[in-house]
């Protein structure tokens, strides 16, 4: 009875949570009765703590609504429920000790000059990129959580893991952190990280050297394959064909795949639909530009690593003006530190204004959300107040969605920051608006023309 109630509760949670949250935190749970107590089994401590902290009230409330005083007690545990049938052992484990004939290590690419059985993987997982030095915030929290679980259980629930977002937001850092985590747990694991262009280059070399079979065996024998910037596969038909079969072979063997891109999988032009579909089989997570608090934390961490005492007010000054990505922040701080070391002057706000004069001047010329809202309101002849209101009529909602999409494209603000600027809306509302307008620009000539006109107005 209580287990059946849990199935109903799952339905409620699926309605209330985003698809991403449900897939990451609720789907992995297993339920079983132990006397008058319903035990929820989580795959690891991280999921257990998260569900207990974030969702316990929703679960208990649902049980009380359905059964009143007869609602079961709730307990959490780690592992699989005792009655769960033991799975048949996979032909190849998620992280396995390789064949003695093949030296296992961390690899970068296929070598066409050696027989595949003797191919030696050169280490290219950067040991400096760890979970411990990845600064976490709302913008990347889900991405880090998913990466941690993959490192702990490669080939498990989130396979493939697809991370997408703009340049310099930490996607590559997470790839290396997962690789380091897997190797720490199993030093013999064969982990391959590469840029998508390297995969293409390796395939071309294999074709030139009549070594395509060795190429296939190499890539299909790894324990974990991480490919950065998958969007560069666009319009490379033969590479997509080979990757399609490699992808299928690795997933069938429960080997972990992580992919990154600068855009949502279905928005990658020039990539076959069958690949886009497979990219979404596991878990897809957006990595957004960091919010103010995270930008400050990144600056303080970087300064600490450099042995510099960065005043709080200086960190906030820089973080409020540079919003686009982590690399830009770190580059600006490096320039400040270099100038301070060269001149011997203390790091103050006035000193930072001088050291970053050209960079700050460029930022001040950028389009703001306020300008976008006013321009769109004037264009569609609606009130500025409507842009922030809760009104849902199409005459107001569509311009609001256009303004949100323009804000994402033309500013450095994160989705949560854009949502706040539109009357405190949730970041998922902004994401929906961006996807809706992208779709309408393909389907509606009027929306496409409106959007282009607004871009020209705002950029002039």
From Swiss-Prot:
SMART domains: AAA (SM00382), Bac_DnaA_C (SM00760). Residues 124-340 are annotated as: Domain III, AAA+ region. The keyword DNA-binding applies. Keywords: ATP-binding, Cytoplasm, DNA replication, DNA-binding, Lipid-binding, Nucleotide-binding. Belongs to the DnaA family. GO terms for molecular function: ATP binding; ATP hydrolysis activity; DNA replication origin binding; lipid binding. It is found in: Cytoplasm. Domain I is involved in oligomerization and binding regulators, domain II is flexibile and of varying length in different bacteria, domain III forms the AAA+ region, while domain IV binds dsDNA. This is Chromosomal replication initiator protein DnaA. Residues 84-123 are annotated as: Domain II. It holds the Pfam family Bac_DnaA_C. GO terms for biological process: DNA replication initiation; regulation of DNA replication. It comes from the Bacteria. Residues 1-84 are annotated as: Domain I, interacts with DnaA modulators. Oligomerizes as a right-handed, spiral filament on DNA at oriC. It comes from Shewanella sp. (strain ANA-3). ATP binds at residues 168, 170-172.
């Amino acid at each position: 009875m209580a287990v059946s109630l849990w199935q109903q509760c799952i339905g409620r949670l699926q309605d209330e949570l985003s698809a991403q949250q449900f897939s990451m935190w609720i789907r992995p749970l297993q339920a079983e009765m132990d006397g008058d107590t319903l035990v929820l089994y989580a795959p690891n401590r991280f999921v257990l703590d998260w569900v207990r902290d974030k969702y316990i009230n929703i679960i208990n409330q649902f049980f009380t609504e359905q059964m009143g005083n007869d609602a079961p007690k709730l307990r959490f545990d780690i592992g699989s429920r005792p009655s769960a049938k033991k799975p048949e052992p996979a032909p190849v484990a998620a992280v396995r000790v390789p064949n003695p004939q093949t030296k296992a290590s961390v690899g970068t690419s296929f070598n066409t000059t050696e027989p595949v059985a003797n191919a030696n993987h050169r280490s290219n997982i950067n040991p400096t990129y760890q979970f411990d030095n990845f600064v976490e915030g709302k913008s990347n929290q889900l991405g880090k959580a998913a990466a941690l679980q993959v490192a702990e259980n490669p080939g498990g629930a989130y396979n493939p893991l697809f991370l997408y977002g703009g340049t310099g937001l930490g996607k590559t850092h997470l790839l290396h952190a997962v690789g380091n985590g897997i190797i720490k747990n199993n030093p013999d694991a064969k982990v391959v990280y590469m840029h998508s262009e390297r995969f293409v280059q390796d395939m071309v070399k294999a074709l030139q050297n009549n070594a395509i079979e060795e190429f296939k065996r190499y890539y299909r024998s790894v324990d974990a394959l991480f490919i950065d910037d998958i969007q560069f596969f666009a319009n490379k038909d033969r590479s997509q064909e080979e990757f399609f079969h490699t992808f299928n072979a690795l997933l069938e063997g429960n080997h972990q795949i992580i992919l990154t891109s600068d855009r949502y999988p279905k928005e990658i032009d020039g990539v076959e639909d069958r690949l886009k579909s497979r990219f979404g089989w596991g878990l897809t997570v957006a990595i957004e530009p960091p919010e103010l608090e995270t930008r400050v934390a990144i600056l303080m961490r970087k300064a600490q690593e450099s042995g510099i005492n960065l005043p709080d007010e200086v960190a906030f000054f820089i973080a409020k003006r540079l919003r686009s990505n982590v690399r830009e922040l770190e580059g600006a701080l490096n320039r400040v530190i270099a100038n301070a070391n060269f001149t011997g002057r203390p790091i103050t706000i006035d000193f930072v204004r001088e050291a970053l004069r050209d960079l700050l001047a460029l930022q001040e010329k950028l389009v703001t959300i306020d300008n976008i809202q006013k321009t769109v309101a004037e264009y569609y002849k609606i009130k500025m107040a409507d842009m922030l209101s809760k009104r849902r009529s199409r005459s107001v909602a569509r311009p609001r969605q256009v303004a949100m999409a323009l804000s994402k494209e033309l500013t450095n603000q994160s989705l949560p920051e854009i949502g706040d600027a539109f009357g405190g809306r949730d970041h998922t509302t902004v994401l929906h608006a961006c996807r809706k307008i992208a779709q309408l620009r393909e389907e509606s000539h009027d929306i496409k023309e409106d959007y282009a006109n607004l871009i020209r107005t705002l950029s002039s």
